[in-house]
From Swiss-Prot:
Annotated family: Belongs to the UPF0434 family.
Protein name per Swiss-Prot or TrEMBL: UPF0434 protein VC_1876
GO cellular component terms attached to this protein's record: cytosol
Organism: Vibrio cholerae serotype O1 (strain ATCC 39315 / El Tor Inaba N16961)
Coiled-coil segments: none
Superkingdom, natural source: Bacteria
UniProt xrefs under Pfam families: Trm112p
Amino acid sequence: MDHRLLEIVACPVCKGKLTYDKDRQELICKLDRLAYPIKEGIPVLLEPEARSMSMDEGR
């Protein structure tokens, strides 16, 4: 994941900052507790495609 891209992308729900989870290949919004998948190197920033994170994840 290009770190320059992380500087400009935002959560489509709250417009907050996203962090990159290399192991899961996801972009994480800690505010909304949503994880957006990265498929074939392309972030899929669609709310229906995001998975809800448990309360224990992302701590």
